[in-house]
Structure formats: C-alpha cells, structure tokens
From Swiss-Prot:
The lineage of its organism: Bacteria, Pseudomonadati, Thermodesulfobacteriota, Desulfovibrionia, Desulfovibrionales. It comes from Oleidesulfovibrio alaskensis (strain ATCC BAA-1058 / DSM 17464 / G20) (Desulfovibrio alaskensis). Residues 292-545 form the Glutamine amidotransferase type-1 domain. The gene is pyrG. Catalyzes the ATP-dependent amination of UTP to CTP with either L-glutamine or ammonia as the source of nitrogen. Regulates intracellular CTP levels through interactions with the four ribonucleotide triphosphates. ATP binds at S15, L16, G17, K18, G19, L20, D72. The active site is at C381 (nucleophile), H518, E520. This is CTP synthase.
C-alpha cells in the first residue's frame, strides 16, 4: 500500500490541541496494525526552536539524531512509542534556508525564485520524503491557525498535494473551537463556520471537522456544522476536554473517529486493540497513593516549558501506581531564609535543565536542602551541574566553586565549556568555542553512557550501557574528579571513553542522582523511563515515612 497522508489544520485560535489530536489519531491507526508517523510543519521563521525563549515557545524537544524540535514531537513519540527525527519537523525558516541554499548553488539555473512554485515545492518535497514502502499513513500537522500570513505557503502546498495524490491517498482534518456559552446554555458554531470558510477560500475543503469543546456537541449541532461547512453528516466529531490526556485516543474511538478515517482512506478494516490504553487510563484513575514533587526552575510560569518532564513524572507514577502532584517552585525566589518553607511537604525535589545564571543560586539552595534533609533528589542537565557545584562548595571544601557559564573568573570551574567531544554518530571529533553560533552548536542528540554497577543508576537501568539524549554546552571538569570522589561524590555514568561525566550520585542518601542528559525525552506512558520510575519509587517511600 502506498503511503497515505492526513493533513491536520487548526482554526479560530491557537493551542487547541492539534498535536494531541494528531498523536491520538496516530495511536488509533497504529492500534489497527498500521505503520504510522507524524510530521509537524511550523510557519515561524526561526530555523528551529533551539534558540527560542521557553516563555514564547515552550519546551525544545530533542530527537535521537540531535534535532531541536517542537514540543509536539514529544506527544508523537509518547503516543506512538517510536522515535522521531529531523524529518518530522520543519519550519518556514528551515524551508526558506533550503531554497536559498539551492539558489546560491545555482540549482534554479538563474530563474526567479518565488513562493510559488519554489517554496511550495520544497514543502511538498519534505512531506513526500516521508513516504516509503513500509509506511502506511503519515499525519502532517500544520502549525498556527488558518488565516495566518506565514502559514499560507504550507496550506497552498497541501492543497496542491490533493491534486497530486488523489482523494484515496489524501484527506484533510480541521480542528476548530466550538465554544459553550453558559449564559445561553448552548454551543456556538459561528467561529467554526468562518474558520472553514477561510480554509475553503484557499481551495481546501476539509473532509472531517473535529470540534474542540467543553461538552460533547449534539447530533443536531453536528448536522448544522456539516450543512454549513459542506462535509458529510457523520464527518463531524467532538474533541471533548478530558482530565487525563491519555484518555483522548479512547474518546476518539468511542466517537468512531478512526473508523471514519479508515473508510475515507480505504484503510484495512481491522478493529484497534486499545487494551493497553485502557489499562493506562485505569491506572491513572485508581492510584494506590500520592506523592508531591517539587520542580525547582525559572520557567515555572509556563508549564509547557517542562512538558516532557511533567509527562515523565506522571509515567513514573504509573509505574508505581502513584498519583503525582506537581508543585512548581520559582528558583529566583528561594533564599537561605525561606528555602525550608518553600520546599516543605515535598516528597521529592527535581531541578530541571536550563540556561543562564538567573535563578541558579536558588536551585543550589534547594539541592543543599534535599541533600541535608534526605529528600529524594533528581537533577537533570543544569540540575546535575548545580548538584556538583553544591557538593563542591559545601562538602568538598571549594566555597568558590561555580560553572564557567555563570562566573568566568571563579578559581574553581567544576563545570566548564565543552570545547571538543567525540560524536559517536559521525565518528568525528566535534569542536566548539565561546565564539560559535548559538543555534545547533551544543552536544545534541543520543549518546552512549557506561553505567557503573552498584549504583542507583544501575539499579534503575539494569544495564551497563544505555543511550540517552543530550542538549548542553557545559560539562563536568575532570580536573576535579578525584577531589570530589574523595569527598564522597559517586560518578555512576560516564561516556564510553571515560572522558565525560554523565551521572553523579551521593551515598548515604535515600535517592540522590544527577544526570547530564535529558531522560524525559525517552519516557513513554507504556514504558516509563527507569530513572523516573526509581525517583518516584523513592518519593513514595518518603511520603510513607512523612506520614508516620
């Protein structure tokens, strides 16, 4: 079977949940035995989100091949349980960059380079590159909202693909908002009508309309939407708000959403096996206990900045049959005087990754509190670096210890800029310096890690070698390895050549671990990451202890 394409657009307003909708549809088709992938096309001009402010964009999701991508790729991976790569995310910036590179190379033979056909052809090219003999369905999510100026080339490209592929290989799903007005006691369809009108004005007639709503849309209202939007009566579906995002595939299945897609695209009529999804939802709904985890960071005002982290902690809870309540603590507000009050009642403390000096001292205070008060601690990327700094200052007798990122003049740079490292994918030595460009110049993607036996890390992984995803410029300074080891710091994970420290721990503590990589990017609801599983297990023991 030739690869078939499903294009998902959004109307009325942004953040309706196109990514979750795409991931849920993909999961349903996958449960039918089909091979599925998902692609996200973002209309913004940035080449990738790697240098974007988390407050504007949210999390930057890193793939195995080192691509810095949209956070929706995290949803795709978690719902499908398969890794994404660079081909699964493009932006206007990356598309234009490809076209301009070709123009400079002379590929267009002196012709005038225009949005149509050159930009639209490039968009079609990256979409069609997904097609292969072993892929049944490719879902393509168009970022932004219908009507956005920057999104027009993408919509034009997918309009053309309908003619290129034919109706049996291409369909359009339009996600739109159907607000419920409590005062009037009814849903309003006008925003949806206008959104579809805008879409049809550029030549795209949606095949299915998915209505994001607080309450399920009635059959009468579905028929009204179908009439005004020129779709079949049974092609209007509700996307109702749910308590748990992992309920969405089950909700779509109950609506018959996947069945309609299968009929329209003439896909094999096999009933999906959703037993694992049902088991997951049941486990989430019936926990045997609860833990409270504090996330100490500086992007706490925008939870999307820690999206994968949030989900990975939930996964750890699922593995231990525990509900996980998250408390976000602004590290900039933590002082020596209020640290105990700020972190009171927590069963576990997690310090996530980040960049820059703002809020770092608050993180270090939180880590000291966790270490001295025997509260389970998990440090990720910058969180591990801060744990090393705290240990060096307060245990190893290096009061001026710091990271070169925060203080270039410190006499004890226990964390310093990585200037070269061996890339196990390209089999080459990568080099960077302080003058390198910011975008795409970090240690990015999946790298192997040797795990030391007899450590918390080995207890979690039960393996001597693992592969984890990285996103950092700074690393532990090996000049301090012996001194910190003598003071009691355990180096439980190293690069295979022994040159780079990947994990550290502390003995005589319930659970204290820092890792230089980002394990949250490899945690799936069906297969929680081992480190999150063990962290939540330790937090569960702490919760029981606190109740006594």
């Amino acid at each position: 079977m030739k690869t078939k394409f499903i294009f998902i657009t959004g109307g009325v307003l942004s953040s309706l949940g196109k990514g979750l909708a795409a991931a849920s549809v993909g999961a349903l088709l996958q449960a039918r035995g089909l091979k599925v992938t998902i692609q996200k096309l973002d209309p913004y001009i940035n080449v990738d989100p790697g240098t974007m402010n988390p407050f504007q964009h949210g999390e930057v999701y890193v793939t195995d091949d080192g691509a810095e991508t949209d956070l929706d790729l995290g949803h795709y991976e978690r719902y499908l349980g398969i890794p994404m790569n660079q081909r699964n995310n493009y932006t206007s910036g990356s598309i234009y960059h490809r076209v301009i590179t070709k123009e400079r190379r002379g590929d267009y033979l002196g012709g005038t380079v225009q949005v149509i056909p050159h930009i639209t052809d490039e968009i079609k090219s990256v979409i069609m590159n997904l097609a292969s003999d072993d892929l049944d369905v490719a879902l393509v999510e168009i970022g932004g909202t219908v009507g956005d100026i920057e999104g027009q080339p993408f919509l034009e490209a997918i309009r053309q693909l309908r003619s290129d592929l034919g109706r049996d290989r291409c369909m359009y799903i339009h996600l739109t908002l159907v607000p419920y007005l409590a005062a009037a006691g009814e849903h309003k369809t006008k925003p949806t009508q206008h959104s579809v009108k805008e879409l049809r004005s550029i030549g795209i007639q949606p095949d299915i309309i998915l209505c994001r709503c607080e309450k399920a849309v009635t059959d009468d209202l579905k028929h009204k939407i179908a009439l005004f939007c020129n779709v079949e009566k049974d092609a209007v579906f509700s996307a109702v708000d749910v308590k748990n995002i992992y309920e969405v595939p089950l909700s779509f299945y109950e609506e018959g959403f996947d069945q309609k897609i299968a009929i329209m695209l003439q896909l094999p009529a096999k009933n999906p096996d959703l037993s694992k999804w049902q088991e997951l939802v049941d486990t989430c709904a019936n926990p045997q206990g609860k833990v409270t985890i504090g996330i100490v960071g500086k992007y706490v005002d925008l939870k999307e900045a820690y999206k994968s982290l949030h989900e990975a902690l939930i996964h750890g809870g699922v593995a231990n049959k525990l509900a996980v309540e998250l408390k976000y603590v602004n590290s900039e507000l933590i002082t020596d005087e209020n640290v105990a009050e700020s972190l009171a009642g927590l069963d576990g403390i997690l310090v996530p990754g980040g960049f820059g000096s703002r809020g770092v001292e608050g993180k270090i205070r939180a880590i000291r509190y966790a270490r001295e008060n025997k509260v389970p601690f998990f440090g990720i990327c910058l969180g591990m670096q801060c744990a090393v700094i705290e240990f060096a200052r307060n245990v190893a007798g290096l009061p001026a210890a710091n990271s070169e990122e925060f203080d270039e003049q410190t006499p004890d740079k226990v964390i310093y800029l990585m200037t070269e490292w061996f890339d196990f994918r390209s089999k080459q030595v990568e080099r960077r310096d302080s003058g390198s460009e910011k975008g795409g110049t970090m240690r990015l993607g999946s790298y192997p890690c040797a795990v030391v036996k007899g450590t918390n890390a080995f207890t979690a992984y039960q393996a001597e070698k693992v592969d984890e995803r990285h996103r950092h410029r700074f690393e532990f300074n090996n000049a301090y390895l012996d001194k910190l080891k003598e003071a009691g710091l355990v180096f439980s994970g190293l690069s295979p050549d022994g040159e780079l420290v990947e994990m550290v721990e502390i003995k005589d503590h319930p659970w204290f671990l820092g890792c230089q990589f980002h394990p949250e990017f490899k945690s799936y609801p069906m297969t929680p990451h081992p480190l999150f599983r063990e962290f939540i297990k330790a937090a569960g023991k702490q919760a029981v202890k606190s109740k006594r």
